[in-house]
């Protein structure tokens, strides 16, 4: 149902719980995350006045060097989740699953600070999260080693010129913008619908020499524009923050690619399944888009470990399907042979 623009995130969550009472705990958890996001937004907005947010510290679970803002965001979201009905948290900034409230019904996977390379230069950063039901048993990891289809909600926050909170509880994807006059997230984009086709793609083109043939062929054909097999010109965008590219795709369509490649450690791409690709896939699908890993639907993947990586292609359905055709040989580029045997964005 269409909601009035300017209605609050709290109003939306109340309506979702009225529609489906079983979402009450999920809604409470989203409220906690939104409150923490407002605090993080304040810190980001102060920039260097808040200290050296780009100062480097220890390495996180994935080998990335933690920056000061990574640690600040992690601590603030963990504090918020301690007050929510959450039993376990899988965070990019923690090696192991963190246990909060034994017996609580939910588990949260979170990237507290997406786009860390943008810290300190005034560019967009964000937060990504996915909420799942707890899997009973003694293994705290078990709740996360389930398909992305088990998520009860997913969302991301963009800390940019405006702070936006993008969320789905399985009933469409909506964007709420932080109203600085009263620190309330208010609806600005209701029931998002990604256009099925758009002439814009996002990829880190500096890695072209490492890409597999299908990715190279797809991008080459886009670059050939109206004179090539795609019969139209394309624009390229890349922000180094997944949340910013995802929000752009939600609003005006296009496709995002982060494939696996032949660099050491990048065979499965760089993004993490639990707290990056699965939440984004849920949001994109709820807005009518597509999200794959090159072999199949992201939401059907089951992680074998907490920090498992996954290739990612998402966006307008026609363009996501087009990328897939380059892998299964249905879309050989002009002057090239079909790419037999290339069945996925994941390298063996």
Swiss-Prot record:
Binding site for Mg(2+) 1: 92, 111, 113
Pathway this chain belongs to: Carbohydrate biosynthesis; gluconeogenesis
Catalytic activity: beta-D-fructose 1,6-bisphosphate + H2O = beta-D-fructose 6-phosphate + phosphate
Keywords for this protein: Carbohydrate metabolism, Cytoplasm, Hydrolase, Magnesium, Metal-binding
Biological process according to GO: fructose 1,6-bisphosphate metabolic process; fructose 6-phosphate metabolic process; fructose metabolic process; gluconeogenesis; sucrose biosynthetic process
One GO location term (cellular component): cytosol
The family this protein is said to belong to: Belongs to the FBPase class 1 family.
Name recorded for this polypeptide: Fructose-1,6-bisphosphatase class 1
Annotated source species: Methylorubrum extorquens (strain PA1) (Methylobacterium extorquens)
Gene that this sequence comes from: fbp
């Amino acid at each position: 149902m269409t909601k009035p623009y300017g209605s609050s995130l709290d109003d939306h969550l109340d309506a979702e719980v009225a529609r489906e009472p079983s979402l009450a705990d999920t809604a409470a958890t989203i409220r906690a995350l939104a409150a923490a996001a407002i605090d993080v937004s304040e810190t980001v907005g102060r920039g260097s006045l808040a200290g050296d947010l780009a100062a480097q510290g220890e390495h996180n679970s994935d080998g990335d060097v933690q920056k000061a803002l990574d640690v600040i965001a992690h601590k603030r979201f963990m504090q918020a989740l301690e007050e929510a009905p959450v039993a376990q948290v899988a965070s990019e900034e923690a090696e192991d699953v963190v246990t909060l409230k034994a017996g609580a019904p939910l588990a949260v996977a979170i990237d507290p600070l997406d786009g860390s390379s943008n810290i300190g230069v005034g560019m967009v950063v964000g937060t990504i999260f996915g909420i799942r039901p707890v899997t009973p048993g003694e293994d705290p990891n078990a709740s996360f080693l389930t398909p992305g289809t088990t998520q009860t909600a997913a969302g991301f926050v963009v800390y940019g010129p405006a702070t936006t909170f993008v969320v789905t509880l399985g009933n469409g994807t909506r964007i709420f913008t932080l109203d600085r006059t009263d620190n309330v997230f208010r609806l600005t984009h209701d029931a998002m619908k990604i256009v099925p086709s758009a002439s814009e793609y996002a990829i880190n083109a500096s890695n072209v020499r490492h890409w597999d043939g299908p990715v190279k062929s797809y991008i080459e054909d886009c670059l050939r524009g109206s004179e090539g097999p795609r019969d139209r010109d394309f624009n390229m965008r890349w922000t180094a923050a997944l949340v910013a590219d995802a929000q752009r795709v939600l609003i005006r369509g296009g496709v995002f690619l982060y494939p696996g490649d032949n660099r050491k450690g990048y065979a499965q791409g760089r993004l993490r399944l639990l707290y990056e690709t699965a939440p984004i896939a849920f949001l994109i699908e709820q807005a009518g888009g597509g999200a794959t890993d090159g072999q199949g639907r992201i939401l059907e993947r089951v992680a074998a470990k907490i920090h498992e990586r996954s290739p990612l292609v998402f966006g307008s359905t026609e363009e996501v399907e087009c990328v897939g055709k380059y892998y299964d040989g249905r879309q050989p580029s002009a002057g090239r042979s079909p790419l037999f045997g290339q069945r996925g964005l994941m390298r063996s």
